[in-house]
Amino acid sequence: MSPTRREFLGTLGGLAAGYALAPALRAAESSGKPLGLALCGLGNYSNGELSPALLETKNVKLVAVITGTREKGVKLAKLHGFDEANIYSYEEWDKVAANKAIDIVYVVTPPGIHAQNVLAAFGAGKHVICEKPMAISAAECDTMIAAGKKAGKRLAIGYRLHFDPYHQELVRLAKTQEFGPFMKIKSANGYTLRRKSWRIEKKLAGGGALTDMGIYSIQGVCMAADANPISVTAKELPKTQPELFVEVEQALEFRLEFANGAVADVWSGYDANRAEIFAEAAKGWFKGERPVFSYRGLNISTSAKGKLDFGIFRQQQRHMDGVAQAFRNGTEVTCTGEVGRRDMVIIDGIYESIRTGKRVELKYS
């Protein structure tokens, strides 16, 4: 079982003091060798996407796992060739700290326990990659960012699409304004969820479709606008399965407004299979259709180039290699903890708008 948040907060200071400045770790980072990574949480994403990608990465390799199910760790140890002694429980952060082969901990647990896992990893003197959403509130994000700074370690979020060439084309178009600024943006992302899972438990998921699927649209919209929204107006949609979605929303709609007058209308839900984004400017457009936010086979086109084709690759490999290289070289990445926090400010604002029925101004400081 995972330790409680109170237990982690109580021990963070001592762990950070003991391990944040380990000389051997600094030497490993500067050597040019692949950094060692430990997966924290061995669910479907770790086993189905991250593990295969780590067989292809050049800048980082899997050297350990942190899991509540040792059998899962044994399988990955055999596949990736690391010692079974490097399979740790969630209570063995002292051993993680002592393992000099581990440079990065990739937190892939449910969002409700991201903060406690990230705090523990920083306390163990490791860099951190944290899956999305970064946390279940902007306040938790602040705690995580502060812990990383105290430990002198880097934090990145698992925003794989920052390293995806299709979405990088959207970023390029927005920054160069080749078509002019994108003033009208629409996006939708969701799927049909019919059975119970941790994703509909508020304590673990933080929210419903918004924190799981809507966050992709938030990312895409901010890429297209090349800015952070200044306000949001949102409403929850009627539930078609109220007996299932007791604690969280099933579907919602929201509008984001930007300082230059651009607007983005977004839908997110667990009651339909949708994935799309459309950004329109005076001289052209960018369009992504299902699957636009998926792991592979993206269907994206622009008014200038038609359908884009960047070949076959693993997004997760590009993401982890890119982040590891930045950690090793001391260079910047776009998927920072601050960006993860920005998205949680927006999500907090969406839920506030639903509660109050009012337009909410978004404040990032």
Predicted regions and their residues:
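N-terminal secretory signal peptides and thylakoid transit peptides that target proteins
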Residues: 1-16
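N-terminal Rossmann-like dinucleotide-binding module
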Residues: 12-80
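Predominantly a Rossmann-like dinucleotide-binding segment in NAD(P)-dependent oxidoreductases
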Residues: 33-34, 45-46, 161-245, 357
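Beta-loop-alpha module in the N-terminal Rossmann-like domain of NAD(P)-dependent dehydrogenases
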Residues: 86-147
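Rossmann-fold dehydrogenase core element
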Residues: 143-160, 183
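C-terminal capping/lid region of NAD(P)-dependent oxidoreductase domains
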Residues: 153-154, 180-184, 352-365
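C-terminal glycine/acidic-rich active-site capping loop/insertion
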Residues: 160, 275-345, 354, 358-365
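Contiguous beta-strand/loop segments that form the cofactor/metal-binding neighborhood of enzyme cores
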Residues: 212, 218-294, 318-331
